[in-house]
Curated annotation (Swiss-Prot):
Gene3D superfamilies: Knottin, scorpion toxin-like (3.30.30.10). This is Toxin NaTx-22. Negative results: has no effect on Nav1.8/SCN10A sodium channel from the grasshopper mouse, a species pain-resistant to C.sculpturatus venom. Disulfide bonds join 12-63, 16-39, 25-44, 29-46. The keyword Disulfide bond applies. GO terms for cellular component: extracellular region. GO terms for biological process: defense response. Expressed by the venom gland. It comes from Centruroides sculpturatus (Arizona bark scorpion). GO terms for molecular function: sodium channel inhibitor activity; toxin activity.
Length: 65
C-alpha cells in the first residue's frame, strides 16, 4: 500500500521539506518495508508498504509531538 507511515512513538507522519529531503524519506520508507519514498506535502510519502504498516492518520489516534 502507499501512504504516510507513522512514527510509532508519536502517531505522526515524518515531516520533510521539499525535494531536498527525498533521500532521507526514501531511507525512512525502506526501513518501514516500502519500495521507495519521497517528500510530498511536508510528509514522507511511501510506496510499496505492507498492508500491516500503519499509515497516517490512524483512526482514533491523534498525532502527539
Amino acid at each position: 500500500k502507499d501512504g504516510y507511515p507513522v512514527i510509532k512513538t508519536t502517531g505522526c507522519k515524518l515531516i520533510c521539506v521539499g525535494i531536498s529531503d527525498n533521500k532521507s524519506c526514501d531511507r525512512f520508507c525502506k526501513k518501514q518495508g516500502g519500495s521507495h519514498g519521497y517528500c510530498h506535502a511536508f510528509g514522507c510519502w511511501c510506496e510499496g508498504l505492507s498492508g500491516s504498516t500503519p499509515t497516517y492518520p490512524i483512526p482514533g489516534k491523534t498525532c502527539k509531538k
